[in-house]
């Protein structure tokens, strides 16, 4: 894997509050190696470890993007919905930002069927055919389309399982993470002090509650993906 410089600096991370963990009572002992101190009842994350693993994750996604691999970003907490969508769109990745439907990846054939249905309905609507149906039928299909757009809108162009999945919150997206583990899909995961660092392939210790912290981590990963994509396009 290529090692590159990703301009990850500790001061910027401190300003974004990346180092603030959860209360000391609410922690996972497996996170001990990633914690540097306790302050006012809160665990403080060791930012040199964060920088190291974030840099490793950037190297991984850069190499994967350079080889034309597919990415999926998962983050469904209300506060990260827009952030996840904009990061994914910028890096031309697929994303899930509303709700992870159980079996979305482990039962891929069902997801694929839903995606075909979604694409067909979108095509029908764009062509104006839904307006020629009886009102009741049209209303039912429009409701169906709206539901599919909500839950599958971010993966509408997905034609197969992703090569790498980036998960914004381990606790919130546990089902998605377990499905990736089951299928052997490599994962990159933000982990706060109440998480299990052993579940993902690359765990990035960071505050997963503060928007500024999540934005910083996602921005670094997205920049690395974009650089890798540019390299892929130049060589093909």
UniProtKB/Swiss-Prot annotation:
One of its GO terms (cellular component) is mitochondrial small ribosomal subunit. Keywords: Chloroplast, Plastid, Ribonucleoprotein, Ribosomal protein. GO terms for biological process: translation. The keyword Ribonucleoprotein applies. One of its GO terms (molecular function) is structural constituent of ribosome. It is found in: Plastid, Chloroplast. Disulfide bonds: none annotated. The keyword Ribonucleoprotein applies. It comes from the Eukaryota. NCBIfam families: rpsB_bact (TIGR01011). Belongs to the universal ribosomal protein uS2 family. This is Small ribosomal subunit protein uS2c. The lineage of its organism: Eukaryota, Viridiplantae, Streptophyta, Embryophyta, Tracheophyta. The gene is rps2.
């Amino acid at each position: 894997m290529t090692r590159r410089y990703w301009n990850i600096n500790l001061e910027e991370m401190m300003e974004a509050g990346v180092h603030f963990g959860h209360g000391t009572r609410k922690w996972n002992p497996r996170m001990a190696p990633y914690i540097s101190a306790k302050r006012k009842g809160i665990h403080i994350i060791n930012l040199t470890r964060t920088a190291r693993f974030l840099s490793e994750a950037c190297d991984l996604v850069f190499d994967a993007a350079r080889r034309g691999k597919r990415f999926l970003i998962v983050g469904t907490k209300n506060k990260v919905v827009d952030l996840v969508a904009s990061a994914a769109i910028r890096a031309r990745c697929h994303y899930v930002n509303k709700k992870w439907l159980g079996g979305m990846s482990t039962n891929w054939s069902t997801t694929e069927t839903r995606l075909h249905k979604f694409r067909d309905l979108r095509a029908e609507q764009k062509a104006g055919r839904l307006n020629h149906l009886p009102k009741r039928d049209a209303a039912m299909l429009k409701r169906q389309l709206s539901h599919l757009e909500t839950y599958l809108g971010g993966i509408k162009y997905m034609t197969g399982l992703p090569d790498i999945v980036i998960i914004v919150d381990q606790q919130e997206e546990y089902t998605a993470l377990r499905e990736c583990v089951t299928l052997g899909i490599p994962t990159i995961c933000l982990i706060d002090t109440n998480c299990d660092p052993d579940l993902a392939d690359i765990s990035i210790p960071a505050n997963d509650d503060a928007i500024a912290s999540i934005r910083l981590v996602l921005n670094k990963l997205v920049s690395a993906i974009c650089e890798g994509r540019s390299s892929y396009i130049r060589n093909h």
